[in-house]
A protein has these predicted regions:
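Amphipathic alpha-helical polymerization modules
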Residues: 1-244
C-alpha cells in the first residue's frame, strides 16, 4: 500500500505545481503580476523497526505557495495616468465592501460619478490617498506626479498617492486581480519611500522560459508518479490471482 500512497501524493503535488506554473505563464503579460512559486515537504516517515536508521518516506505534500516580489521591468507608455513603483511598495486601493487592498498595477483611469471624477484602477477599484480617502480629480485636470507620489494640477498639489510596504510580504494573501490583502503574518502597513514614475508601468516578473522548463520537469514527475500507481495496481492484481 505504501507505493500507492506515495504515488497518489506525488501526483497531487505535481498537479498543484503545474497549476501554479500555468497561472504564472497565463499572467506573464499582466501588469504588476508577481510570480508564484510552490514549496513541498516530506510527509511523515515510518520505521520498520525501532533500530536507529533512516526512516521510510511516505510521500510529499504542498508546504507553501509564495510570491516573488522582485520588481518587473518598467514599460514606457507615455500615458498620463500610468504609474510605476520603482522599489519596494504597493498602491492602496479600495476593494469590495470598502476593504483596503494593495496592488503593484499602476494602470489607472478616470471614473465619472455623480458629477465628479475619481482615480480608479483598471478593475474599477478606487485609488486611495495618504489619508485613506478616494482621490477626486479636479475638473479638466492635467495631472502631473512627483517622485514622492504627489499629484498636482495647475502647479497645485491636490492629492498624494498612498504607498505602503510590509514587514513580511510573503504573508500577504492574494485578493484576486493582482491585488493582495493584509494578514496577521504580513504585519500592518509601513509607509514606503519608493519612487513613482509617471507614464510608465511595471511588467510582470515572470520568466516564461524558466516556467516552461519547470512545467516539463513537473510533467515528467507527474508521469513517474503515475507509473508508480500502475506498478502497484499490477502487483495487487498478481497477488489477488495467487490467492485464487
Amino acid at each position: 500500500m505504501q507505493s500507492f500512497f506515495t504515488g497518489r501524493l506525488g501526483i497531487r503535488a505535481q498537479q498543484q505545481r503545474m497549476d501554479a506554473i500555468a497561472a504564472n505563464i497565463s499572467n506573464s503579460g499582466t501588469i504588476g503580476y508577481k510570480c508564484g512559486n510552490t514549496a513541498f515537504k516530506d510527509t511523515l516517515y515510518t520505521r520498520m523497526s525501532d533500530s536507529v536508521g533512516a526512516g521510510r518516506g511516505t510521500g510529499v505534500a504542498l508546504f507553501s505557495t509564495h510570491r516573488d516580489f522582485s520588481a518587473g521591468q518598467p514599460l514606457q507608455t507615455g500615458v498620463t495616468l500610468d504609474f510605476c513603483i520603482e522599489g519596494d511598495g504597493f498602491f492602496a486601493v479600495e476593494g469590495n465592501g470598502g476593504k483596503v487592498i494593495y496592488t503593484r498595477n499602476g494602470n489607472f483611469c478616470v471614473s465619472h460619478e455623480s458629477g465628479r471624477d475619481y482615480l480608479v484602477t483598471a478593475s474599477g477599484n478606487y485609488v486611495l490617498d495618504r489619508n485613506g480617502e478616494r482621490i477626486a480629480l479636479p475638473d479638466g485636470a492635467n495631472v502631473s506626479l512627483s517622485d514622492a507620489g504627489e499629484l498636482t494640477s495647475g502647479g497645485e498639489v491636490f492629492a498624494a498617492l498612498k504607498l505602503v510596504t510590509f514587514t513580511n510580504k510573503d504573508g500577504l494573501s492574494a485578493a484576486g486581480g493582482g491585488c493582495f490583502e493584509i494578514t496577521e503574518t504580513s504585519g500592518g502597513e509601513i509607509p514606503s519611500n519608493a519612487k513613482i514614475t509617471q507614464g510608465c508601468l511595471e511588467s510582470s516578473n515572470v520568466d516564461v522560459t524558466a516556467q516552461f522548463a519547470q512545467m516539463i520537469s513537473a510533467q515528467r514527475a507527474f508521469s513517474l508518479c503515475g507509473r508508480t500507481l500502475s506498478a502497484w495496481n499490477q502487483m495487487e492484481s498478481e497477488a489477488n490471482n495467487l490467492r485464487t
